[in-house]
Curated annotation (Swiss-Prot):
Belongs to the YbaB/EbfC family. This is Nucleoid-associated protein MGAS2096_Spy1605. Binds to DNA and alters its conformation. May be involved in regulation of gene expression, nucleoid organization and DNA protection. It comes from Streptococcus pyogenes serotype M12 (strain MGAS2096). Pfam families: YbaB_DNA_bd (PF02575).
Length: 99
């Protein structure tokens, strides 16, 4: 019985630590960039879009497709950074579970 109580206490402790790491991650910002940094997209760690910036050189009414492609590239870059940071930050908890 005592062993089960210890496991529960350890699990609760890990849960609190994980919640803190999730909050820390959510407070961080990640900026994805397109080729030549012509488009940047900034997200919080919980994947909320904070802003998109376009360099003047990429804004061409005759070539909207390039702007769309660069925007997609910047967004995907930022989301990949968030996913990698999440795995690095929260993945460590998987090996610490008491069961």
């Amino acid at each position: 019985m005592m062993n089960m109580q210890n496991m529960m206490k350890q699990a609760q402790k890990l849960q609190k630590q994980m919640e803190q790491k999730q909050a820390d991650l959510a407070a961080m910002q990640f900026t994805g960039k397109s080729a030549q940094d012509l488009v940047t997209a900034t997200f919080t760690g919980d994947k909320k879009l904070v802003g998109i910036d376009f360099k003047e050189a990429v804004v061409d009414p005759e070539d909207v497709e390039t702007l769309q492609d660069m925007t997609t590239q910047a967004i995907n870059d930022a989301l990949t950074q968030i996913d990698e940071a999440t795995k690095k930050t929260l993945g460590a908890f998987a090996g610490k579970l008491p069961f």
